[in-house]
Amino acid sequence: MSVRRALIALSIAVSPLAVATAAPVAKDKLLVPPTGAVHYVVVSDAGKHGDIWRWTLPDGRTAYRHSQSLRGWITETDQVTTLDAAGLPQKVEVRGISPSGDAAETFAISGTKASWTSTADSGSSDGRSGYYLPAGGVALSNEVLVDRLVAAGAAGIDLLPSGHATLTVGPNLTITGSKGPKIIKLVSVRGILSSPITMWLDENNRYFADVGSISTVPAGFEAIANTKAMRDLQEATTATEVRSIARRFLTAGAKAPVLFDHVRLFDADKGVFLENQAVLAKDGKIAAIGAAGSIPAPAGARTINGRGKTLVPGIWDSHMHIGDDWSVLANIANGITSFRSPGTEIDQALSATKRRLSGDLLMGEPFVSVLIDREDPLAAQGALTVTSEATTIAAVRKVKAAGLWGVKFYTSMNPAWIAPGAAEAHKLGLHVHGHVPATMRPIEAVRAGYDEITHLNFVMMQAMPQEVVDKANTAARIEGPAKFAKDVDLNSPEMRKFYAELKQRGTIVDPTLVIFEQTMTRDGGTPSPAYAPYMGIISPVLDRSFKSGGHPLVENYTRNDYRKSFAKMVGLVRELHMAGVPMVAGTDGWGIELVRELELYVQAGFTPAEALQSATIMPAKVVGADKRTGSIAVGKEADMVLVDGDVSKDLGALRRVVTVVSDGTVMDADELRKAAGYSGKPR
């Protein structure tokens, strides 16, 4: 499953995650683009995924049509937009189906009142003007927003339902398409997300393309989606800004000794909380630990009073893909000082790591694995694609040559190539994990060489009907567990034998349970527990997405059926934990979901200390770094987080980060959040 939060392009940034509330308009009832319609394509390095068209209707309204299949996730939508004299949307209607269900959405202005209804929310605004940014809709329709931002200049424009956006112009670049060379310019849009969104304009300052892991480009320019010059320029523009932020925090003064006194200390090695402790960090290491008041502060040291607060090791997100430079900065602000990135392109991983080591990027320490998938229409974008056992082994060797940590096999892999690929990876000292390929059961993947199973739905595949297992490289990997998990007997002899073998082999599980809480249980309209504490502090657009619903209901299943299946998923975590199967906490999201992941582990029977170990010492052990980090112990690296509250009683206190120490550098969390684009503290 890929619930990527990179949101590199504006098209992804405003896509809905909403539950179907009524039967969506069928594909054959949607608008049909005429000959001569402006044509865009959606592509990645895995190939073409879809088409988007735009044309003008006889009455002057603008129509859009989007048709896409991304690894089996279907989008069939249309949109009609009416603009007023100022070029702002006066009326918008969206129809069809997205991967998350019914895409229906309407917006209209009557007099001074604007009203909207989407699958995420509904509301109105009386007297406030602005550009209505759909919760979903056809991505290309946001070309109108770009036009308005260009016309507005530095002042920007107000957004509806709320927010304010601006556009800044960057450098030009000459590219070549089917009609010859073309000059385009890079721009950044702010106010949509907490970080800028980059896109490209043509020579007339009109929207031209989004280029990223998934790109939207004009037909005839498909090749530019993987043009190194475009990606390099995008990265360089962002890198310049984040470099100045990194230098602001990574100062000599920030590396001075620091003494935390009168703190509640979490000993991750023993899994206990110790009251009224003192911890001294010096020269990037933990120098001393003792009773409060027992450690003298060295000359030039900073002393922090920790009364009412808890000092924990630097937090790990064991499933957080390296996104843009801003997302990794936000994770530092949330106390994530180390992370595993299970599926990152080699060049991106090497660039980010190099800039981190040089002090140009504020990012936790990454442990990166690379996707390997069979060349197939359903292959993962960003993967090294293979066509045989030999090319699988070659891909594994390429990952090792890059100096990265592991390989992550994906759902379209030929099962016959897993064992030889895993054997080569182990010979080279690489970690092997991933989704379980279609037609394989998880125990078969483990026997073939998996050290770890990624995502709990693939663990649940052990008990799924064969027709679900056979299509695990499609939406069946979500819909199967959503439909059938509720009926699984977790205590059956077969499942008990399964748990025992996972334990015996030392197999690790990366549950990402928080994903399934969102996809299986949510009706929409209110923020999920993972996001509620962040409402109002990141961006208005994300606030709307945080109120989205779950995966669309299929066949005759109800949301209550899905909720029962999620309860069984929580039960599966409980059974794995009781059987002694090690688990590491990850999000496959923004990172802000991590605390909710830990809260769900407590629901599954973990103690708060055990849950916190899954995000500290346990992942450090998995990556082989536990001798130097993962716990607060004398001689280890000074990776620590001071949070407001008693974590032993309330894991939610982990959201209230006060101070972050990464490799001995002391940083104020309020300043980090501000730099990352947050407007306040999570609740």
Which role fits each region the language model picked out?
Residues 22-80, 91-106, 151-177, 220, ...:
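N-terminal cleavable signal peptides for secretion/export
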Residues 74-142, 193-204, 208-220:
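Contiguous hydrophobic, core-forming segments of folded domains
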Residues 248-250, 265-278, 291-293, 607-612, ...:
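Acidic, glycine-enriched loop/beta-strand segments at the rims
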Residues 270-312:
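Histidine-rich, glycine-flanked metal-binding segment
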Residues 329-350, 365-371, 400-413, 422, ...:
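Divalent metal-dependent hydrolysis catalytic cores, especially in the metallo-beta-lactamase
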Residues 395-413, 459-604, 677-683:
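Active-site neighborhoods of metal-dependent hydrolases
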